[in-house]
Design a protein with these regions (language model features):
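Residue-level signature of the C-terminal ends
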Residues: 19, 59-63, 99
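Alpha-helix initiation and capping sites
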Residues: 10, 22-25, 50, 62, ...
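Amphipathic alpha-helical scaffolding segments comprising HEAT/armadillo-like alpha-solenoid repeats
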Residues: 30-31, 63-71
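Short, hydrophobic/amphipathic alpha-helical patches that form generic packing surfaces
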Residues: 47-63
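Generic structural signal for well-ordered, non-membrane alpha-helices
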Residues: 27, 31, 51-55, 90, ...
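Catalytic toxin/effector domains delivered as secreted proteins or via bacterial secretion systems
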Residues: 44-45, 71
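Amphipathic alpha-helical binding modules
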Residues: 76-125
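Short terminal alpha-helical segments
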Residues: 1-41
């Protein structure tokens, strides 16, 4: 899936995946979404981090393949963490809504990509 290029443009996805892998993936994602929802303001790199974490969650619980992710790593995480990560959908959607309400990107294509992530995680897509 070659989507979401506006959200991940110039973002080091590999480094984030390494950070998630070196931690407990469900705990890392939970913390990321909680911090994103609670922060008074979000920088563009922080918005990108939340979007990539939401993409990881979507890949794990909705069995989607994203071109930018290492497929073997995601397959391993699906096997071990899908059940625990399924509980994070609501917090991910809440964090993405928070971005759209308070830190809406200027790029309309990035906004559309965020809205698509919300739909995917909400089960509408």
């Amino acid at each position: 899936m070659a989507a979401f290029e506006h959200l991940v443009k110039s973002y080091d996805v590999g480094e984030l995946l390494d950070d998630i892998a070196s931690a407990d993936p469900p705990a890392y994602l939970r913390r990321c979404f909680a911090e994103g929802s609670a922060a008074p303001a979000l920088s563009w790199p922080r918005v990108q981090q939340l979007a990539v974490c939401a993409m990881v969650l979507d890949a794990l619980i909705n069995d989607r393949d994203y071109e930018i992710f290492e497929h073997e790593l995601i397959a391993d995480w699906r096997m071990h963490y899908a059940k625990a990560c399924a509980k994070l959908k609501d917090s991910a959607v809440q964090a993405l809504h928070r971005i759209l309400e308070r830190n809406r990107p200027e790029d309309p294509q990035a906004v559309a990509e965020l809205e698509s992530l919300v739909s995917r995680l909400s089960g509408a897509e």
